[in-house]
């Protein structure tokens, strides 16, 4: 018997090919995520969101730290929320909401300069639509990557939904204290009335809370809240609501 010897060749993969492969996987995952967000938003054109990313995170922490506690949230239709609260939020959070495209370039640039001066992210320059994008899908983490994703989701919201629907979802999902979400829950938690009965002064005080709802919940009746509420109350008359209002 004659033995035949041969040479075995080991196939190596170049680093460039690995980089291309990894990049393709990352791009595919990123695209799938964006399509998921877009599909969810399209569904919410006619179906109300059951919960948000913020609510789910809060529910987990409450179940761990305060087992009996639960998220307080009750969806109510747009026309069952006081116009006072709508005007107060626009006056406080996004005065051009009815006419802008979801972005306030001046506010974003101002936030950029402020963050650069501080050496860290302390401001975001977010419109109502940007806040909604963050609440629905993202986290409270402050990073430029999260901000970039927020801007993309904002574009999706503004493209798929009309302004009134965006505002309706916002009003029903924004946080007003730990475990307190939406106008109805906030009105009952702080004033023991439905959101439809909120007066101008009550609405102004609720609007003040939005940047730091948990802090204001723990420091009710602060002098700053009263002063800021007075400023918002004066601006409410000029607040422009979405066209159908």
Swiss-Prot record:
It is found in: Cell inner membrane. The chain crosses the membrane at residues 20-42. It catalyses: [GlcNAc-(1->4)-Mur2Ac(oyl-L-Ala-gamma-D-Glu-L-Lys-D-Ala-D-Ala)](n)-di-trans,octa-cis-undecaprenyl diphosphate + beta-D-GlcNAc-(1->4)-Mur2Ac(oyl-L-Ala-gamma-D-Glu-L-Lys-D-Ala-D-Ala)-di-trans,octa-cis-undecaprenyl diphosphate = [GlcNAc-(1->4)-Mur2Ac(oyl-L-Ala-gamma-D-Glu-L-Lys-D-Ala-D-Ala)](n+1)-di-trans,octa-cis-undecaprenyl diphosphate + di-trans,octa-cis-undecaprenyl diphosphate + H(+). Pathway: Cell wall biogenesis; peptidoglycan biosynthesis. Its main location: membrane. One of its GO terms (cellular component) is peptidoglycan-based cell wall. GO terms for molecular function: pentosyltransferase activity; peptidoglycan glycosyltransferase activity. It is a single-pass membrane protein. Its EC number is 2.4.99.28. The keyword Transferase applies. Keywords: Cell inner membrane, Cell membrane, Cell shape, Cell wall biogenesis/degradation, Glycosyltransferase, Membrane, Peptidoglycan synthesis, Transferase, Transmembrane, Transmembrane helix. The keyword Transmembrane helix applies. It is an enzyme of class 2 (transferase). Peptidoglycan polymerase that catalyzes glycan chain elongation from lipid-linked precursors. PANTHER family: BIOSYNTHETIC PEPTIDOGLYCAN TRANSGLYCOSYLASE, MONOFUNCTIONAL BIOSYNTHETIC PEPTIDOGLYCAN TRANSGLYCOSYLASE. Belongs to the glycosyltransferase 51 family. This is Biosynthetic peptidoglycan transglycosylase. It comes from Burkholderia lata (strain ATCC 17760 / DSM 23089 / LMG 22485 / NCIMB 9086 / R18194 / 383). The gene is mtgA.
């Amino acid at each position: 018997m004659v033995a035949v010897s041969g040479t075995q060749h080991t196939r190596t993969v170049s680093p460039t090919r690995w980089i291309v492969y990894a990049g393709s996987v990352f791009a595919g995952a990123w695209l799938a995520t964006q399509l998921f967000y877009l599909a969810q938003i399209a569904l919410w054109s006619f179906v109300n969101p059951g919960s948000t990313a913020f609510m789910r995170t809060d529910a987990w922490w409450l179940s761990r730290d305060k087992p009996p506690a639960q998220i307080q949230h009750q969806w109510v239709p747009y026309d069952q929320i006081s116009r006072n609260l709508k005007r107060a939020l626009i006056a406080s959070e996004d005065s051009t909401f009815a006419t802008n495209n979801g972005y306030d370039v001046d506010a974003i640039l101002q936030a950029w300069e402020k963050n650069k001066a501080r050496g860290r992210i302390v401001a975001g320059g977010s419109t109502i639509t940007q806040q909604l994008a963050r609440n629905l899908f993202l986290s409270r983490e402050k990073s430029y990557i999260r901000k970039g994703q927020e801007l993309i989701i904002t574009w999706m919201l503004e493209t798929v939904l009309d302004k009134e629907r965006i505002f309706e979802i916002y009003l029903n999902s924004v946080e007003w204290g730990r475990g307190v979400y939406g106008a109805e829950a906030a009105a009952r938690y702080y004033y023991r009335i439905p959101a439809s009965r909120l007066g101008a002064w009550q609405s102004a005080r609720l609007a003040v809370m939005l940047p730091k709802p948990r802090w204001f919940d723990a420091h009710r009746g602060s002098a700053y809240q009263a002063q800021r509420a007075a400023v918002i109350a004066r601006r409410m008359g000029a607040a422009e609501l979405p066209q159908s209002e």
